[in-house]
Amino acid sequence: MGTSQFQNVLADGKKTIDTLKSTKNQTKTASLLRLSFSEVHTVMERAVARGLSRRNENEEYEHVCLDEKAIRKGHEYVSILYDARNGAVLEVAEGRKDESVKELCTKALTNNQRANVRTVCTDMWPAFIKGATTYFPNALHCHDLYHCVT
C-alpha cells in the first residue's frame, strides 16, 4: 500500500473505529472495510493514544466498574477499569490477579480521584472485591445485576 492510500485509511479513521465498535474484532473490521489487519490496528492504536492524551487528571469519576474479559481460549484475561456512567475505559491490565487490579487502580486514577469515587461495581472475583475495598476506601461496593441474578 502506498503512502497516499495509507493516509486515506487514517483520514477515514472514524469509519474504522465505528466498525470496530460494532464488530468488536479487528480481523472482521479489516475484512469488512477491505483493509489489512495492520491498518486497522494502527487506526485503533492512534485512537487510543489520542484518547489517553485527552485524559483529565482532575476529572472526577463517581461510579467505576472493575471487570475482566477473556482475550484467548485457555483462561487468559485482561482486567478493565471503566467509568460506569458512560462506559469509557480508564485502564486495562493483563491478568486478573491482585497485581493487575493494583495496576488498574493506581495507574488510571490519582489518589484524589480514587478518594472521590462513590461506588465501585465488580463481579465476585476475589481480586476485584479486595481491590474495591483497598483502592476505593470511601466508596460503596456493589455487584452488577448480571452476577446477582441466578
Regions found by a protein language model. Give the residues of each.
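Short, basic interhelical loop/turn and adjoining N-cap
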Residues: 27-43
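Generic secondary-structure boundary/loop-capping signal
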Residues: 3, 68, 90, 143-146
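Basic, short loop/linker segments at the boundary and entry of helix-turn-helix/winged-helix-like folds
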Residues: 1-17
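Residue-level signal for the short linker/turn that defines the boundary of a DNA-recognition helix
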Residues: 23-25
